[in-house]
Amino acid sequence: MSCAKPHILIIEPFYGGSHKQLIGALIEGLNHGDSEIFSLPAKKWHWRARTSALHFAQLIPRDHAFRVLFASSVLSLAELIGLRPDLAACRKIVYFHENQLIYPVREVKQRDCQYGFNEILSCLAADMVLFNSQFNCNSFLDNVQPFLNMQPDFKIKHIREQIEKKCQVLYFPVNFERFPIRKECVKGETAEDLDEKCIHLIWPHRWEHDKNPKLLVDTLCQLHERQVDFKVTICGESYQEIPEEFEHIQEKLGSKLVNFGHLEREEYLKTLLTGDIVISTADHEFFGVAMLEAAFCGCYPIAPNKLVYPEIYPKENLYNTSNALTKKLYNFCRMPRVFRKQRDQFFENFNFDRFSAKELVPKYLDIFNKHIADEQS
């Protein structure tokens, strides 16, 4: 692929978090000059989803040699191709980090159906549709028809069949090689010393309602009331105001809350290395990069028995109810030695390779190269 102009057009309307990480991993695997990125900062998601197609239609040069177009589902691909028909000849690949067909809203009337409809149109306009998990793929396809049935008349049929044949699951490539490896014992400390240490809980998610911060706060307050020893870090990105559930948590937990707020990357990694358990309380998760990152740094993952989590973690790491979560954490905090034995068993059996950038990025590049080869033949 040696050409003066790049062959691969990468578009990301929400260039931050896992969206940015994915593109970074792909760029590292591509030859210099093979690709060109067009992006917008990871702010104001709703406006990015509504208007980015028009923005990029004006920005992408018309004098190009693109043969592959790779974009996240935030972009309304059908709109872009309508505005820029010269890009229609590209092999168009849409990547779903999440899907809007099952995005949880507090009230049905709050749902803006246009986002989900744009995703369906993007799939119809695409040549290939990639999902970061089987759960993401299944939940999207299973809800295409129910979503379209919300239209009061002139029901649209047989759309799932058109999309399904384009779909493929390709896990998000986590660049574990950039992470420090946690040592079993800190130098100078014995196993007995570690048993005396209180359990460090970490919640590293976006501060938004779909991550269910209320369940986290309720659980931590119950542990605090039961007078078990623990400490907790609540980090993750906050794009808006602090959730109301977090407003008085510092007063409620006192010194047990050792970190509260977003941490810069270096400090974040250091904190993960001190953690014992990483918790998810999510109502909305299609992969869970933060959970895997924390697990790789030595934190034992505990997650709901739903969404993507049963696809990734063994049943011992999953809980079915809020009471089960509290009970599991209570027992671990009360008996650190029992916990650390179970954590050791988890890491002996868990395979991180199936989620690693080293294993997965070549599969993405094979897709790009195949499409370019098809165009050249």
UniProtKB/Swiss-Prot annotation:
Signal sequence, renumbered to the chain: none
SUPFAM superfamilies referenced in this protein's UniProt entry, alphabetically: UDP-Glycosyltransferase/glycogen phosphorylase (SSF53756)
Example GO molecular function: mannosyltransferase activity
Keyword Ubl conjugation tagged: no
UniProt keyword list: Glycosyltransferase, Transferase
Keyword Transferase: yes
Catalytic activity: queuosine(34) in tRNA(Asp) + GDP-alpha-D-mannose = O-4''-alpha-D-mannosylqueuosine(34) in tRNA(Asp) + GDP + H(+)
EC class of the enzyme, as a word: transferase
Known EC number: 2.4.1.110
Function field: Glycosyltransferase that specifically catalyzes mannosylation of cytoplasmic tRNA(Asp) modified with queuosine at position 34 (queuosine(34)). Mannosylates the cyclopentene moiety of queuosine(34) in tRNA(Asp) to form mannosyl-queuosine(34).
Family per record: Belongs to the glycosyltransferase group 1 family. Glycosyltransferase 4 subfamily.
Descriptive protein name: tRNA-queuosine alpha-mannosyltransferase
Source organism (scientific name): Drosophila melanogaster (Fruit fly)
